[in-house]
Every structure is written in structure tokens, then in C-alpha cells.
Swiss-Prot record:
Name of the protein: Proline-rich protein 35
Compositional bias of kind Basic residues: 16-26
InterPro entries: ZNF750, ZNF750_Znf
Naturally occurring in which organism (per UniProt): Homo sapiens (Human)
Biased composition regions of type Basic and acidic residues, renumbered to the chain: 316-336
Length: 571
């Protein structure tokens, strides 16, 4: 059906402008109100489905209000002509499409024509003058005259919240009705008002900490002065129409406790651990960081001791007896450390993993060997360079002197750090920890004496270690005992590249027990990518499997086969 045939039924009033683009005869929703329908190619949104239908049907995106208001033609007329909101109500279904209703069939009280100045603005924008209308239909009155002609028609149908404010002052309207009141009593719908004109946004607080969270001025001060203002809403790219200016935020009451200083909150840690006030803790924090070694933990946190540090730091005031003890401890510490030339510089958990991997590649041994103590294998019981590593058939159990000496060394390190903290915090915090420091010094001297006695007890002789001496009776075959007791094994272990302590410790030969547990049977299998080494293979430095290769390289092939055979089998 042609357009002429379709427009014949409409009437003579609409036939004259049937081929012309339809005017936007409605105002979209006021800014700030929810919407149900939105155009997908322009910012038009409305609560009425028929309005969006007309918008899409007549391709009104180029004529929509949001685009019209941006034009310079509308910018010069904005002060004189201000559109009134027209209520989209279901009582007037014919007005959603004015082309399907004759002009003479309008209610008498209603304003004649589409009751908006937007049509005139559109006509001025596109054609440069009022549109030619059907004969007999009066032209649109001026806005001032239209304001006086309000009858019981459209203004009676307006919802209560959409009526313009009666006071005339936009600031006199309540904040809840600000967005819903008409443009004569408030800010216009489009474009969104300036941040200072919309008072409802003054209660909006968006920050990283949540909505309506009180923002203190120095909360984001660690970002710098330029970023501190933008840090309140970093997640909104175009937050300028939503946020008020910086003066719109109400002045936050200063809290009783000041905002923590932005240096990683170390004064808070000191305050919680040592019970200092916040200001004194911030003063006491300053001399701690430059003097402490590179591996020391945060000040005030004395949870995990670090045994791999250098000599213990010296405290400020001390009597000569304690100074001498500290010097001896500082001299004995590097000697113990430097005996291990290739000791891995790893975190504390890594040597235990290395120890477990190297032991899992050993031949089958006792279960006490597979699950040793929790101490650090690079502990202070390691001897000096004058003798090789003491290899014991059984790993040190928790009651052994090695374990006790390791615990004593950790306790000594803890006491040294506590004394250092107290010596540095004493003048700054105004405390007097002199009695506590003296008592800690006495305890540390006693621990040092016990530790040195234990170290002298476990120090091996200077001769090469004779591995034929066993503490447990040999239950395995005699050939294996002879193979393990060869004197060439000592030079293989002591000469060459020094291994990390976790690597060398498991290489001690274990007498085979009568039965094999599942864990030992699993650990007797070599790694899948590494075949069994021939007797002339070199020692792989730094790997746990190389220790076993070095151990087997000085043995006969029969002994190597006996190591990999089940325990009940004959060699």
C-alpha cells in the first residue's frame, strides 16, 4: 500500500505534512529519573514505549533533544525559550503519534498543536521558520502566552511530581523533587546540569572505601597532591556530571586519632607490639631502618628468626664483659657461615625442600632418615673449615644436641634483636628499659655459654671421617657393610666441590632395616629423566642426585646393584 493511500484515511489535517519528518513531540525523561526504554544509537531515553517507537520509526536520532541542545542555534535561544515537560500518560494515546489524529479532533481545553516549543526549535534549526501547518489550525503561541493558557487539560493530567515548582526559585524545591520538577522550577532535563546547580549530588560520596564513606583530606596523601583529589573516584571515567566539586563535600570532623602516616604503616606495628603512642612510635621508627641489615624484618616483628645474617648487631650501652662476649659471638658466627662455600642463598623453606628432594633420591634407608627434624640443615652446628661435615647415621632427633644448639642459636638471635630494638627505642620513646636489657643480657650470656659447650661437643676430629663406625648394628648383608666402609669414600665427600648441607647430610650410609615402608620404596627409584650413572661419571655439583652418584662412583658395580635391589634379595 502506498503512502498516499495510507495517509488518505488519516484526514486532511495531517496530509500536508505527511511526507515531512516528524517532530519530536515529547520530551524524554527528566535527568535523574529512571528509564525503561533507550535508543541504541543516541542518548534518547524515555519511560514510554510508544515514544521510543516513534523515535526509532521516524529516525529522530538526529533530531533528538540531546543533540539539538548541543547546537549553537539552541545555545543562543536557551535563555528565552525553555521547554515545559509534557507528561506521557496513558490517557492520551493519540498524542504519541500526531500524524494519525486530525488537528480538529483535539480536546477543547488542550493546547492546539503539539504542545511543545521543541517543535518550533526543531523547525528553526532545520527549516529556519515555523512549519507550515494545516489550514484552520492555529500556530503555536509564544511560550509566555502558552503559560497563561493553561486549562484543565494537560496541566490537570500532569503527575504531581512533574508539576513545576510554585516558588519559582529552583533552590526552594526539595532535593527529592529536584530532578522530577519541571525545567521552569529546576534545572533542565538535557544537558545534565552543571555540578554546582544540582544540589542532590551533594550527598553523594563515592570513594575507594565505598559510598558515603567519610573522606578525610589526608587519606590519599601518599599519592601526591595532584592525585589525591582524583583518588576519590578512580573507577569512573566520566564522573564530572555525577560528582560535585571539591567544595561540595562537607567538612569531615577531624578524628580523635590522626590518620596514619603513609610510610607502610610501620609506626602502627611498633605501636601495637611495644605499646608506644602513635607520635612517639613515628619518632622511634626513624633510627631503626638505616641501621638494620638488609635482611632484617619490619621493626617490631620478631616472629621468625633469620639465622643467615651476619654478626649480631651491637647494642649502644654495654659493659665490657658483655662486649667481649658479643665480639666472640660475632667472630664465631662468620667462621661457621663461611665453612660452607657453596651454601645456597635461599629462603628458609628452600633448604628443607632441597633436603627432601635429595633424600628422596637416595637408596632405601630408615624412616627416621626420611623424615628428619624441622631444623634448618644449614644451622650453626656446622663445623669450621678444619674438619668435614659430621655425618651421623640417624638424623638429629628433637632431643639431640644439634637440635638444642640450633634452638639456642635462634634464641640468641632473638635476644640480640630485642636488645637492639630496646637500645634504639629507649632514648626516643622516653622509656627506661635498663633493667630489662640487663636481664636479657644475662640470659643471653648463659645461652651463649651452653651453645659454645654444645658446639665443642659435636665438633668432629680433624682426621677424615671413618664411615665404618656405625652406631646401629648392621642388619644387612656383609658385602654391603664392606662396600659402605671403604676409606675412599671420605675423600670423595670431603674433597671436590663443597655441597650444601642439605645435600651432604643424606649421603650418610644407612644400615638396611628388615622391612621397607612405602615411602622408602618410592624414594629408592631415581628420577625418571636421570639414568643410573656409570662408575666414571663426575660429581654433579649442587644437585642431590650428584651426591648419590659420587657415593656410588667409588663402589663396585655389584654394590650399586645391591643398592637398587630389594632388601630381601641376595647380592
Amino acid at each position: 500500500m502506498s503512502r498516499e493511500a495510507g495517509s488518505c484515511r488519516v484526514g486532511t489535517g495531517a496530509r500536508a505534512r505527511s511526507r515531512k519528518p516528524k517532530k519530536p513531540h515529547y520530551i524524554p525523561r527528566p535527568w535523574g529519573k529512571p528509564y525503561n526504554y533507550k535508543c541504541f544509537q543516541c542518548p534518547f531515553t524515555c519511560l514510554e514505549k510508544s515514544h521510543l517507537y516513534n523515535h526509532m520509526k521516524y529516525s529522530l536520532c538526529k533530531d533528538s533533544l540531546s543533540l539539538l541542545l548541543d547546537s549553537p542555534d539552541w545555545a543562543c535561544r536557551r535563555g528565552s525559550t525553555t521547554p515545559r515537560p509534557h507528561a506521557p500518560t496513558p490517557d492520551r494515546p493519540g498524542e504519541s503519534d500526531p500524524g494519525r489524529q486530525p488537528q480538529g479532533a483535539r480536546p477543547t481545553g488542550a493546547a492546539p498543536a503539539p504542545d511543545l516549543v521543541v517543535a518550533d526549535i526543531h523547525s528553526l534549526h532545520c527549516g529556519g521558520g515555523p512549519k507550515s501547518r494545516a489550514k484552520g489550525s492555529p500556530g503555536p503561541p509564544p511560550p509566555v502566552a502558552r503559560a497563561t493558557r493553561k486549562g484543565p487539560g494537560p496541566s490537570g493530567l500532569l503527575p504531581e511530581s512533574w508539576k513545576p515548582g510554585m516558588g519559582g526559585d529552583p533552590r526552594g524545591v526539595g532535593a527529592g523533587d529536584m530532578a522530577s520538577a519541571g525545567p521552569e522550577g529546576s534545572v533542565p532535563c538535557y544537558p545534565p546540569p552543571a555540578p554546582g546547580e544540582f544540589p542532590e549530588a551533594h550527598s553523594l560520596h563515592l570513594s575507594l572505601l565505598g559510598v558515603n564513606y567519610p573522606l578525610s583530606p589526608g587519606l590519599f596523601s601518599y599519592l601526591g597532591p595532584s592525585l589525591a583529589a582524583a583518588a576519590h573516584v578512580p573507577f569512573l571515567a566520566s564522573a564530572s556530571p555525577l560528582l560535585p566539586p571539591a567544595t561540595a563535600f562537607p567538612a569531615v570532623q577531624p578524628p580523635q586519632r590522626p590518620t596514619p602516616a603513609p610510610r607502610l604503616y610501620y609506626p602502627l606495628l611498633l605501636e601495637h607490639t611495644l605499646g608506644l603512642p602513635a607520635g612517639k612510635a613515628a619518632l622511634a621508627k626513624a633510627p631503626v631502618s638505616p641501621r638494620s641489615p638488609s635482611g632484617t624484618p619490619a621493626p617490631g616483628l620478631l616472629k621468625v628468626p633469620v639465622p643467615g645474617l651476619g654478626p649480631w648487631p651491637r647494642v649502644t650501652p654495654r659493659d665490657p664483659g658483655q662486649e667481649g662476649e658479643l665480639e666472640r659471638a660475632a667472630q664465631s658466627d662468620p667462621r661457621r657461615r663461611l665453612s660452607l662455600g657453596s651454601r645456597l642463598e635461599l629462603p628458609k623453606a628452600s633448604p628443607s625442600l632441597t633436603r627432601f628432594c635429595s633424600r628422596s633420591s637416595l637408596p632405601t634407608g630408615s624412616s627416621v632418615m626420611l623424615w628428619p627434624e624441622d631444623g634448618d640443615p644449614g644451622g650453626p652446628e656446622t663445623p669450621g673449615p678444619e674438619g668435614p661435615l659430621p655425618l651421623q647415621p640417624r638424623g638429629p632427633v628433637p632431643g639431640s644436641p644439634e637440635h638444642v644448639g640450633e634452638d639456642l642459636t635462634r634464641a640468641l638471635g632473638d635476644y640480640a634483636r630485642v636488645e637492639q630494638r630496646l637500645g634504639q627505642l629507649g632514648p626516643a620513646g622516653g622509656l627506661a628499659p635498663r633493667p630489662l636489657r640487663e636481664q636479657l643480657g644475662k640470659i643471653r650470656l648463659e645461652l651463649l655459654t651452653i651453645h659454645q659447650a654444645l658446639e665443642q661437643a659435636v665438633r668432629p676430629p680433624d682426621a677424615p671421617l671413618d664411615l665404618s663406625v656405625k652406631r646401629a648394628p648392621a642388619k644387612g648383608p656383609q658385602a654391603l657393610g664392606e662396600a659402605w666402609g671403604r676409606p675412599e669414600l671420605g675423600p670423595v665427600l670431603t674433597g671436590g666441590t663443597p655441597e650444601p648441607p642439605g645435600m651432604l647430610g643424606p649421603a650418610a650410609p644407612q644400615p638396611f632395616s628388615g622391612h621397607t615402608t612405602k615411602c622408602e620404596a618410592d624414594s629408592s627409584v631415581p628420577p625418571p629423566g636421570l639414568p643410573l650413572a656409570a662408575p666414571d661419571d663426575p660429581v654433579i655439583p649442587g644437585s642431590g642426585w650428584g651426591t648419590c652418584v659420587a657415593t656410588r662412583s667409588s663402589q663396585t658395580p655389584e654394590a650399586v646393584c645391591g643398592l637398587q635391589s630389594p632388601q630381601g634379595a641376595e647380592v
